[in-house]
A protein has these predicted regions:
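Cofactor-pocket helix-loop regions in the catalytic cores of large enzyme subunits
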Residues: 1-271, 275
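Short, intrinsically disordered, charge-balanced linker/junction segments flanking boundaries
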Residues: 276-281
Length: 281
């Protein structure tokens, strides 16, 4: 393509000319500076097919793995923890499962604003008598519908969640059968949590010992408990540890793998999960 023939103003041209211009420009960069001088940043609001084709273009056309999309900032920390602990970097169930839950926990998320459809499911479930527990450093809108609102101090997610797990252990509320048959290294977790008593962590996270013990019992003894979390948990210096704590909480009580239970990281855009699964990362 003759770059000298490019006009200073917009003018109509053919698809062939436009594509030649784009391709030659990329090829010039690749030949002069190498393939890693190029990168592609995709979109999580496209389809799975679009995500697959885009990453294929970058990897096979540009010959580089410099491809990414918003999940790197979004739930990358959650995906790491989920892959590490349950072998799947995806939600375990759909939002509509709140209709079968007895207890719903939302932490680090403002679904009324960011996930209005999901928020409607959750609000309707609360109106029908499901127990809604909201944990957040700020008073998000959905907390108005909550039976329990834990406004903990910023950056103390792990302290609060570890205290809840420690309380569950101390109250003998763990699911021994689930732990024996479907998990490993519970003894290591138990040892790790020995100093994270509700009394000690209450001073750090700002939630009373009594409330921590109450929430622990409500979550662990429910017939079905489900956890939702958002950017407040994942876009954090301790994001992976935050997610690990939530996953451990679910596993130690057997609150996963049944209708109305599970782990659901609320994605930042409508097809983050699909784009990630299609290789756009």
């Amino acid at each position: 393509f003759d770059f000298n023939n490019i006009s200073d103003i917009f003018e109509e041209t053919t698809w062939e000319n436009a594509l030649d211009l784009a391709c030659d420009g990329f090829n010039n960069i690749k030949s002069k500076l190498g393939p890693n001088a190029l990168a592609g940043f995709g979109c999580a609001k496209g389809s799975n097919e679009e995500a697959y084709l885009f990453q294929k273009l970058i990897r096979t056309g540009f010959n580089t793995n410099n491809v990414d999309h918003c999940t790197r900032l979004c739930h990358a920390s959650s995906v790491v923890a989920l892959l590490e602990m349950i072998g799947s970097g995806a939600v375990s169930n759909q939002v509509a499962d709140v209709t079968e839950a007895e207890v719903i926990i939302i932490i680090g998320s403002n679904p009324t604003v960011n996930h209005p459809v999901a928020a409607t499911f959750i609000k309707n479930a609360a109106k029908e008598g499901k127990t809604l527990i909201v944990m957040d450093p700020k008073q998000v809108e959905i907390s108005r519908h909550a039976n329990h609102f834990l406004q903990f101090k910023p950056d103390t997610d792990v302290a609060l969640l570890n205290a809840i797990m420690k309380s569950i252990i101390d109250q003998d509320l763990v699911d021994e059968n689930f732990i024996k048959n479907r998990t490993k290294d519970f003894k290591k977790l138990k040892e790790h949590l020995k100093d994270y008593t509700p009394e000690n962590m209450s001073k750090i996270c700002g939630i009373s010992t009594e409330k921590i013990n109450e929430i622990a019992k409500i979550y662990a003894t429910a017939s079905a408990s489900i956890i939702f979390w958002g950017m407040g948990v994942s876009q954090h210096i301790h994001g992976t540890d935050n997610a690990r704590a939530l996953i451990s909480l679910s596993l130690m009580t057997g609150q996963i793998g049944r209708p109305g239970t599970g782990l659901h990281p609320l994605r930042g855009q409508n097809n983050v999960q699909g784009a990630s699964d299609a290789g756009l990362i």
